[in-house]
Amino acid sequence: MTEQRPLTIALVAGETSGDILGAGLIRALKERVPNARFVGVAGPRMQAEGCEAWYEMEELAVMGIVEVLGRLRRLLHIRADLTKRFGELKPDVFVGIDAPDFNITLEGNLKKQGIKTIHYVSPSVWAWRQKRVFKIGRATDLVLAFLPFEKAFYDKYNVPCRFIGHTMADAMPLDPDKNGARDVLGIPHDAHCLALLPGSRGAEVEMLSADFLKTAQLLRQTYPDLEIVVPLVNAKRREQFERIKAEVAPDLSVHLLDGMGREAMVASDAALLASGTAALECMLAKCPMVVGYRMKPFTFWLAKRLVKTDYVSLPNLLAGRELVKELLQEECEPQKLAAALLPLLANGKTSHAMHDTFRELHQQIRCNADEQAAQAVLELAQ
């Protein structure tokens, strides 16, 4: 930033979640520096906030090794071109938003040219492939982390990191409107309600749906009025779940929802879900939960050797203890899942204690992340 040139921020987002983060960051920066310029790889939300897109975000949004290999030449060309063009532009700061496989190498290339770099959203280095922290440290001037235990991990290796809180915690209220969510879904206020969330990936839905449905059948024996809501992320997952249900539990009445996962969590007395971001969202919805997860035996064997954490779900990692029950692999079976869910559906001491802890954890990570990220960018730009 000079008197002649406005503050110039380069950004690269590789998927929809990164586009949302990038748009929030740009918005917060524009409030402080109205004439700032933003350039890079952007999705529609970032572009709507005024980011000049040298490449569309969809160019980077590839998943799976086969798709990546098919697009590898194009991805390498884009990264080389960005290295050259950002090197000529000399932005005040480069912000790589998630997409670590693409961005961390790019950040390293730019840092060698004297450009200050930020990696926004820590990869799960604290959980597995921990040696990546050294590459991240060489490539970046600062990591922006959503969760406090991530910062503690980077501090251990002397890699500059700033905990900014989680944007999802900013977006969700501390005290959700349970009856309002039930009204939206058509669930009576006085009914017992269970949410089943068997994952967003095809492999997860395939591995978990049958056990989740059998668990719901067992719970109906205790709670004949039990309302069961099943939000599914897209039409393909819904079709897959309906096929499995027809085989396993054709007579079990459930409410199938297109999306609406957050509403289902807020409306429910308890949730049975796969691990991942859904567990964090469920915690922020203040819905008591049980985490059930299965994977192929060799994958699980490998994961047990690679993963360095005691827990798989974010609520437990945040709490530093088994706050929510995790039933993995052979433990993820209907009798055990139902036994863990029964006390939660009773809405007694167990549920209330979990709810109170969820609220405390929500407050810990509700820090106005967009503003914190903008402040970090401006401090580095000076």
From Swiss-Prot:
One of its GO terms (biological process) is lipid A biosynthetic process. The keyword Nucleotide-binding does not apply. PANTHER family: LIPID-A-DISACCHARIDE SYNTHASE (PTHR30372), LIPID-A-DISACCHARIDE SYNTHASE, MITOCHONDRIAL-RELATED (PTHR30372:SF4). One of its GO terms (cellular component) is membrane. The keyword Transferase applies. CDD domains: Glycosyltransferase_GTB-type. It catalyses: 2-N,3-O-bis[(3R)-3-hydroxytetradecanoyl]-alpha-D-glucosaminyl 1-phosphate + UDP-2-N,3-O-bis[(3R)-3-hydroxytetradecanoyl]-alpha-D-glucosamine = lipid A disaccharide (E. coli) + UDP + H(+); a lipid X + a UDP-2-N,3-O-bis[(3R)-3-hydroxyacyl]-alpha-D-glucosamine = a lipid A disaccharide + UDP + H(+). Belongs to the LpxB family. It comes from Escherichia coli O127:H6 (strain E2348/69 / EPEC). Pathway: Glycolipid biosynthesis; lipid IV(A) biosynthesis; lipid IV(A) from (3R)-3-hydroxytetradecanoyl-[acyl-carrier-protein] and UDP-N-acetyl-alpha-D-glucosamine: step 5/6. One of its GO terms (molecular function) is phospholipid binding. Keywords: Glycosyltransferase, Lipid A biosynthesis, Lipid biosynthesis, Lipid metabolism, Transferase. It comes from the Bacteria. This is Lipid-A-disaccharide synthase. Coiled coil: none annotated. Its EC number is 2.4.1.182. Condensation of UDP-2,3-diacylglucosamine and 2,3-diacylglucosamine-1-phosphate to form lipid A disaccharide, a precursor of lipid A, a phosphorylated glycolipid that anchors the lipopolysaccharide to the outer membrane of the cell.
